[in-house]
Amino acid sequence: MKLELRDVRHVYARGTPFEVEALGGVSLAVEPNEVLAIVGGTGSGKSTLVQHMNLLLVPTSGEVLVDGVDATTLERSELRRRVGLVFQFPESALFAPTVEEDVSFAPRQFALGEEEVRERVLESLRALGAGELAPRSPFALSGGEKRRVAIAGVLAMRPEVLVLDEPTAGLDPATREDLLALILDLRESGVSVVLVSHDLDEVAEVADRVCVLHEGRVSAVGTAAEVFYGDPTQAPATVRVASLLRGSRPEIGDPVRFGETLDALRALQGA
């Protein structure tokens, strides 16, 4: 599935003294089978942008296209099944007596049989390493466990594009690594992932492409290497280290991920 935003503009409180332009003509595509990271400072428009991807917010002007079709012509429920959105701190929306009931809520809205619903629930929980949590109360879980359950509720819809808004915020290192591994697994299974993050190191580890937003506009978009080496001072630690070495050792190339940078350093050590 290809998701496109064309010249999307969004104005909050339009026509009032409090009018604010949050997006100023953003054009961006989410390609099939990719991890696209969206980065930028607080207030740059990241959350506003991703809420247009399944029309939780409707553009003031511009278009959202799903496989070339105007998204406004599609049934909203079907669009939101295909483009799943997980807000920041989604665990605050947990409500059911058990984890299984909570995760099953969304699939049940599509008249699926009980066997199909249960299969999806267990499949999504297992993907997040949380299968054993199914019978437990979500309110008795740790913060990291609650986060996994909340994400599982969206995965149970089997989206073609999964949008994650700051999914690792507040998580312990082990849970964070598990979630980043899940993102890569989803891409391998054919799901595109849009990752909103302030953490450039995690972006470097998983993103195929990076979009930088500044004051509601795209200031850069490209592969992680293209974006980060374009401005190494605003880049993850791996790129900053490599950039310092490239002046005297250009053969180090353009490593972005931690493993790539480590391999380059080992190669230099052995040279």
Residue ranges and their predicted role:
Residues 54:
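Helix-to-loop junction immediately C-terminal to a conserved catalytic motif
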Residues 115-133:
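Conserved ABC ATPase "signature" region
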Residues 137-141, 145:
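Conserved ABC ATPase signature
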Residues 162-165:
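Catalytic Walker B motif of ABC-type/P-loop ATPase nucleotide-binding domains
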Residues 197-198:
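H-loop/switch region of ABC-family ATPase nucleotide-binding domains
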Residues 217-241:
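Conserved beta-strand-loop-alpha-helix hinge in the C-terminal portion
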Residues 232-271:
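ABC ATPase nucleotide-binding domains
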